[in-house]
């Protein structure tokens, strides 16, 4: 069914949203030692011993080049651009973002690695603010998150699940205020007849308390009211797919693998997704495609993600 829908999407005028995550694109070589006198020292040692070989800028460049060939209308990055969220990393990520696209083309939500500890936002995440803010005329009011960006028939709603955590924890939390604003945005965009894509870093489905979204239940309750057409995330570094049963609603959820992974593990092969959305008189026609790097052939292989995204 999904393959059939994808064929239809190609034949019709559609909105193409690309989705990648967890590029971990930065180097820790410029990080100053005084920035490591906290939880970051553990992440730094992990990077020195293992993680710097788990992610490749060369693979990330190949992923972006292949993605560009799909000519998406918009790119969503669901967090973890950095390793430790240090100031030098955030500057490096800012330079990378400016090179690959303008803020009106790219939407970001932060990941747990981007907010590893509490830090001066102007020196860290604030550098990406242009990629994480609502349209000037959007219905969003109040804090930075959730933001609302409307592209064609699609409402892109970005949440921040990135909060500082204790050592050895990579969990996330949205908080009551953010969820209240989310409910208002979902209602407003439903009234506008938009296809609502909600993005966050952490999976809204069950994970361990050490890595999961602590208020996933509250998110589910929020979605049960006004609903959403699609929820997307990163964090897992592997292809993930589920369905949220939000009251009477069934909402598809897709988790994309890391865009730069070099684990030599087929289950964690790098790649990205494309979501194609078309507005019909009878409702929505939509499909999701995966593009995953085959480590043997070194080619990106296209697949259709299961599940019916039409409404």
Placement of each model-derived feature along the sequence:
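N-terminal active-site segment of His-dependent metallophosphoesterases
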Residues: 13-92
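Extended active-site neighborhood of metal-dependent phosphoesterases/phosphodiesterases
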Residues: 91-181, 224, 247-250, 274
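Active-site environment of divalent metal-dependent phosphoester hydrolases
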Residues: 24-28, 83-86, 112-120, 164-168, ...
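Short, low-complexity, charge-dense intrinsically disordered segments
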Residues: 1, 5-12
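Short acidic, glycine-rich surface-loop motifs adjacent to enzyme active sites
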Residues: 186-207
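Conserved beta-sheet core of the metallophosphoesterase superfamily
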Residues: 208-281
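A short C-terminal boundary segment appended to hydrolase-like catalytic domains
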Residues: 277-311
């Amino acid at each position: 069914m999904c393959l059939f829908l994808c064929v239809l999407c190609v034949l019709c005028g559609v909105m193409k949203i690309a989705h990648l995550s967890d590029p971990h694109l930065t180097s820790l070589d410029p990080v100053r030692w005084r920035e490591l006198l906290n939880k970051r020292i553990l992440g730094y040692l992990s990077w020195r011993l293992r993680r710097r070989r788990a992610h490749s800028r060369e693979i990330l460049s190949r992923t972006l080049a292949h993605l560009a060939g799909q000519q998406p209308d918009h790119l969503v990055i669901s967090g973890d651009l950095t390793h430790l969220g240090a100031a030098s990393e955030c500057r490096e990520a800012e330079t990378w973002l400016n090179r690959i696209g303008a803020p009106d083309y790219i939407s970001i939500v932060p990941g747990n690695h981007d907010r590893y500890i509490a830090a001066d936002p102007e020196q860290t995440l604030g550098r990406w603010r242009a990629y994480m803010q609502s349209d000037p005329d959007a219905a969003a009011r109040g804090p930075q998150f959730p933001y609302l960006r409307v592209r064609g028939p699609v409402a892109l709603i970005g949440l921040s699940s990135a909060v500082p955590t204790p050592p050895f924890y990579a969990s996330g939390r949205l908080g009551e205020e953010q969820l209240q604003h989310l409910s208002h945005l979902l209602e407003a965009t439903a009234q506008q007849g938009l296809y609502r894509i909600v993005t966050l870093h952490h999976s809204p489905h069950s994970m361990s308390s050490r890595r999961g979204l602590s208020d996933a239940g509250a998110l589910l309750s929020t979605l049960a009211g006004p609903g959403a057409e699609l929820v997307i995330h990163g964090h897992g570094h592997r292809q993930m797919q589920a369905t949220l049963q939000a009251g009477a609603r069934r909402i598809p959820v897709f988790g994309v693998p890391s865009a730069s992974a070099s684990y030599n593990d087929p289950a964690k092969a790098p790649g990205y997704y494309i979501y194609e959305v078309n507005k019909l008189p009878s409702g929505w026609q939509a499909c999701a495609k995966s593009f995953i790097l085959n480590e043997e052939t070194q080619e990106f292989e296209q697949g259709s993600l299961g599940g019916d995204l039409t409404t």
